Amino acid sequence: MSAFIVLGSQWGDEGKGKMTDYLAKDVDVVVRFQGGNNAGHTVRVGDKEYKLHIIPSGILYKDKVNVIGNGVVLDPEALFQEIDYLEKAGVDIQPDNLMISDRAQLIMPYHKVLDGIKERSRGKKDIGTTGKGIGPCYTDKMERSGIRVCDLINQDVFKENLKENLKIKNDIITKVYGEEALDFDSICDQYIEYRKKLAPYVKDISVEVYNSIKNDKKVLFEGAQGTLLDIDYGTYPYVTSSSTIAGGVCIGAGIGPTLITGAIGVAKAYTTRVGKGPFPTELFDDTGDWIRKSGREYGVTTGRARRCGWLDLVILKTSSRVSGLTNFAITKIDTLGGLEKVKVCTGYKFNGKIIDYVPASLQDLAKCEPVYEEFDGWDKDIENAKTYDELPENAKIYLNKIEEFTNTKISIVSVGPGRDQTINLNNM
């Protein structure tokens, strides 16, 4: 595949960072196309662990070009903190291996303030935002009042846009919520400093990515979050503010759909979720606790404990359908090792019928009862398996069920967090 997508097929945290890192060795360009620093990707290389939030996972290879697309919302403060963190870890970052779209929207201090204020005002109806200003920034983008990277590069344009925006935002902050106004000069000075550091990285990434594909370079598009967090197909309103499915690539990276040759959906061998919202296969017993501890299920960005449950094949089937997945990469199958029995959800019982899709209505999804198929478990120690044949027979039966139900072949199986703990079935 010359231009392919790696995206999450559940509620995020599926292991996209590891999969992108693993696949990046064979590509030339890695592109982030949506989201912001609310994403959290963990990549382990040898005995080192890297936690990435905004920079594409390909940055850990010396010879890859990494691109932050126009569909991303960019917090310059978070970006430069991440660059500093990576450089201290020995990762070289220069304008020849990191590009930033001139059309990307900038997260401003008032976005983060409003994100926190609005979430607190919701009380018990909060939606679990990370408080990083992602939603308010996307709101400004759709209202056509946002400030883009290209606006920051033009200092006069930036000052004028900031002046207009801050007047409106301060009115909301002070008059609606009774909070303290933000200062124009301090924000302006801060972002003018960011401008100097950002400028060398800024390019028209649509042109760059298009030319890469046309020149037979291999391009990997790295998704953030997951299908069930998509603004349209997720469990709305407990979703993110961008399009996390394959269609988001065209908008967020500025290329046409005919240039994309494949889409790999990353999914855990079980299901997790952070924050509120329906979760049909959630486990509230000792098994759920065991999976959480065994899988180290705590958020990279928030540190919040993840809710855990059995694998939901209805969700994976939905993910495959809405993104046109060509392959699955299954992660953390080692976490289930040692359980005597494992289950997968093959349908929902809803209003006396069995359905195999995710309802749009939260109220309907909350009423859905999972229909399970039970399988025998497998040996705990599979972390050293190097080939598919070395996996326990019961694990293979489990994987075969995923392929059969979703009508999507599995191409990669992860048996641990390391690069070398990855089994490639060589069928992509």
Swiss-Prot record:
Record SUPFAM superfamilies: P-loop containing nucleoside triphosphate hydrolases
Protein keywords: Cytoplasm, GTP-binding, Ligase, Magnesium, Metal-binding, Nucleotide-binding, Purine biosynthesis
Main location: cytoplasm
Cofactor(s) listed: Mg(2+)
Disulfide bonds: none
Organism: Clostridium kluyveri (strain ATCC 8527 / DSM 555 / NBRC 12016 / NCIMB 10680 / K1)
GO biological process: 'de novo' AMP biosynthetic process; IMP metabolic process
Binding site for substrate: 300-306
Reactions performed catalytically: IMP + L-aspartate + GTP = N(6)-(1,2-dicarboxyethyl)-AMP + GDP + phosphate + 2 H(+)
Function: Plays an important role in the de novo pathway of purine nucleotide biosynthesis. Catalyzes the first committed step in the biosynthesis of AMP from IMP.
Major enzyme class: ligase
PROSITE patterns: ADENYLOSUCCIN_SYN_1, ADENYLOSUCCIN_SYN_2
Protein name: Adenylosuccinate synthetase
UniProt-annotated binding residues for IMP: 13-16, 38-41, 130, 144, 225, 240, 304
Active site (catalytic residues): 13, 41
Residues binding GTP: 12-18, 40-42, 306, 332-334, 414-416
Upper lineage: Bacteria, Bacillati, Bacillota, Clostridia, Eubacteriales
The family this protein is said to belong to: Belongs to the adenylosuccinate synthetase family.
GO cellular component terms, A-Z: cytoplasm
Pathway: Purine metabolism; AMP biosynthesis via de novo pathway; AMP from IMP: step 1/2
EC annotation from Swiss-Prot or TrEMBL: 6.3.4.4
GO molecular function, one term: GTP binding
Pfam families: Adenylsucc_synt
Subunit details: Homodimer.
Keyword Cytoplasm attached: yes
Transmembrane helix among keywords: no
